[in-house]
Amino acid sequence: MKTYTIRPLDNTPEALAAAVNLLSSNCPSESERYERARLVTEINSVEEQLFYKKFFAAYDLEGSLIAVGGIKAADWASDTHILYMMAVEVEHRGKGVGSGLEAARIQWMRDHFSHGRCLVSTKHKKRFERWDFKIVSEINDRYLMILEF
């Protein structure tokens, strides 16, 4: 039985702060990419409800935030989106939460854009191959992957 729900990240100050805290505490090895000031800026953009950017969240049955992930249009390439800033609380990993967030973000992109591509930078290539992402390059055990639709 699924013990969580996935929906757009709430735009209350409490939800936004919880998302920043979840990302910063669950990605310590990525502190250069997930610098707290950047997290605050990116997450707080939820309040603006931009058409080209969306954050999704997973909530447990009590309504607590257990995972978050974003998708946004690349400002440097037409018809291109980027999956970014995803983290799942340690105790909820391996239960399909991350896969659910990936599915929600990919589906949102397909629902709102008729064609294009989606990029992700990841250490987990098999995770994204199941969504039909293809490897573009590999540097230092990180893969740049692309999904075209």
Where on the chain are the PLM-derived regions?
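Conserved GNAT acetyl-CoA-binding A-motif
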Residues: 109-123
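Conserved active-site alpha-helix within GNAT-family acetyltransferase domains
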Residues: 122-141
